[in-house]
Regions:
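ATP-dependent carboxylate activation and anion-phosphoryl transfer catalytic cores
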Residues: 6, 11, 18-310
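Acidic/histidine-enriched active-site and ligand-binding environments that engage anionic O-linkages
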Residues: 1-3
């Protein structure tokens, strides 16, 4: 199988999987039209489709003087429609040796193109955890940058501004250490039961979680209107703790405390994912939601019918 992808793509748009040669022409036409409509650019490229991979990415910083470092990895395998839903750092599935190899590859890629900025080098890691494949580089600060900030203590936005101002990196690779574990849940205005249909609207009531090891990035407030003309993401809830299991428990508590009235969100689905054995063991691949969505939604439905509120 192969994957058709929009050169200017993002957010899971302009992507088509193709398993049979006879389907390639139609899939190409569909993806090309979607790319033109979404990005104003219909250029496409073709790549090998890695089945059941993990989505592992490395944060890099590069200045104009040739200094390039990475700030560790993130596991972004829990996705819907090729768009990330839950991200964490560091990736539980990586051995120290594999982390070193992938980090070195990310730095080498950035150096090869003379990159200057904060950026993310994204890889697909195959199921046997022996081979990894370059997927793309995001030449910007990403949604999930916060989990890297929490485990490294490095302010990525500040570093990006310093680089843009022409200043040399003060950090060296040996200065970067990963401490603890961080998880981010994206809160999207969408209905998972209706195929993740966007559900913009007015925020009638809003309460975000708080406390030690909790970070919320959002511009929402009670009474505001979430526009239908932009991405459905409404907030990011991040949790940090010394161990991964402590972080999972803290994020569960965050989602129990989070309240938004006015339109549906994916918060309940993310809460169920945090209890799933595959997630707890750190075994999720990009196929996780495709394989388990129905059971996760069914459990949520039974809770709702029984009057139990997560």
């Amino acid at each position: 199988p192969v994957l058709l992808k929009a050169s200017a793509g993002g957010g899971g748009r302009g992507i088509r999987r193709c398993d049979r040669p006879e389907d390639l022409s139609a899939a190409f036409a569909e993806a090309k039209a979607e790319a033109q409509a979404c990005f104003g650019n219909d250029e496409m490229y073709l790549e090998k489709l890695v089945l059941r991979p993990r989505h592992i990415e490395f944060q890099v910083l590069a200045d104009r003087y040739g200094n390039v470092i990475h700030l560790g990895d993130r596991d972004c395998s829990v996705q819907r429609r090729n768009q990330k839903l839950i991200e964490e750092a560091p990736a539980r599935c990586l051995t120290p040796e594999l982390r070193e190899r992938m980090g070195a590859a990310a730095v080498k890629a950035a150096k090869a193109v003379g990159y200057e900025n904060a950026g993310t080098v994204e890889f697909l890691l195959d199921p046997d955890r022996e081979h990894f494949y370059f997927m793309e580089m995001n030449t910007r600060i990403q949604v999930e940058h916060g989990v890297t900030e929490l485990v490294t203590g490095v302010d990525l936005v500040r570093q990006q501004l310093r680089i843009a101002s022409g200043l040399a990196l003060r950090l060296r690779q040996e200065d970067v250490t990963l401490q603890g574990h961080a998880i981010e849940c994206r809160i999207n205005a969408e209905d998972p039961v209706q195929g993740f249909r966007p559900c913009p609207g007015r925020v009638d009531f809003l309460h975000f979680p708080g406390g030690p090891g909790v970070r919320v990035d959002s511009c929402l407030y009670s009474g505001c209107e979430l526009s239908p003309y932009y991405d459905s993401m409404a907030a990011k809830i991040l949790a940090y703790a010394p161990t991964r299991m402590e972080t999972i428990r803290r994020m569960r508590r965050c989602l129990e405390e989070f309240t938004l009235e006015g339109f549906p969100t994916n918060a309940e689905l993310s809460y169920q994912i945090l209890y799933h054995p595959e997630f707890i063991l750190g075994e999720c691949t990009t196929a996780f939601l495709d394989e388990h969505l129905s059971e996760l939604l069914e459990f949520s439905r039974k809770l709702s019918e029984s009057g139990v509120d997560a």
